């Protein structure tokens, strides 16, 4: 099994996502887990064992291989079974869909429902809530044991 985890784009958010990523690793110990991330985040996960390797997404970067359509083509070649989309962006869902990921799990925000196979209902934006709770919900949806 191949799993793609689309990582949050900010260092602090990625750190908060590591517990949910650990739950995915524990639930799927034999899976190859690929982290999709901005290049500057690779060192944050280095040595953690949470991912087996990374692919970079840098839409404004100088390397054309890290842009959306090139990344989608690369994902298609990977034949990924499961994608967890931590970022709530339309772009992330579009890349996962165009990349041919079989099962795409994320929150139904910003018209991205059509690109997800498992579109979870988000909590209201009117009420503040910890983003880590959303990361746990994604992990729980794919069968992971979560805190709480």
Question: How would you name each of these model-derived features?
Answer:
Residues 1-148:
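Catalytic machinery of carbohydrate-active enzymes
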